């Protein structure tokens, strides 16, 4: 009887200590992204004077962490995966004469982000153009 009582006490102590910690180890699909307005810069790699950096303000959140303007007409997000602090994606934009597919990753650290985007643009009757961009960004405040 005494052994059983000790094991019940041990078990209850274990659960009282473990349960509060279990949320720390639970598999979450959240990244350390502070939601709000983000200033995102895409710089072609290697940098050239022919291509100026692309700078845009985007509203990012846990549900929309991909730092690309997916709401642009003709653009859609094909896949999105989150691993640790990093979001990986594949997106596609279709316009009249060409299709651009981008494969990217962005690693968040609360108020900043770094990553890379590779684009492949194909147009009817032309060679596919491939470009690689370095992605950087900082949170600027709340979305408007």
Question: PLM ranges: what are they?
Answer:
Residues 9-20:
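Bacterial N-terminal signal peptides
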Residues 98-103, 116-118, 129-133:
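Short, surface-exposed coil-to-beta transition loops
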Residues 39-76:
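Short, solvent-exposed loop/hinge segments that bridge or flank secondary-structure elements
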Residues 123-144:
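Edge beta-strand at a domain terminus
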Residues 90-107:
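Mid-chain, well-packed structural core segment of small domains
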Residues 24-37, 81:
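N-terminal helix-cap/turn-to-beta initiation motif at the start of protein domains
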Residues 40-42, 88-95, 116-122:
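Short beta-strand segments that buttress and anchor functional surface loops
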Residues 1-6:
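N-terminal secretory signal peptides that target proteins for export/translocation
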């Amino acid at each position: 009887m005494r052994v059983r009582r000790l094991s019940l006490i041990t078990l209850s102590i274990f659960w009282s200590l473990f349960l509060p910690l279990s949320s720390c180890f639970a598999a979450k699909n959240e990244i350390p992204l502070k939601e709000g307005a983000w200033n995102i810069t895409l710089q072609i790699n290697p940098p050239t004077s022919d291509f100026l950096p692309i700078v845009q303000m985007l509203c990012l959140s846990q549900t929309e962490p991909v730092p690309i303007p997916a709401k642009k007409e003709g653009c859609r997000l094909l896949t999105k995966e989150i691993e640790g602090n990093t979001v990986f994606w594949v997106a596609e934009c279709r316009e009249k004469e060409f299709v651009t597919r981008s494969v990217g990753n962005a690693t968040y650290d609360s108020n900043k982000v770094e990553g890379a985007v590779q684009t492949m643009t194909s147009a009817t009757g032309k060679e596919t153009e491939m470009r690689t961009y370095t992605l950087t960004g900082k949170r600027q405040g709340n979305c408007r």
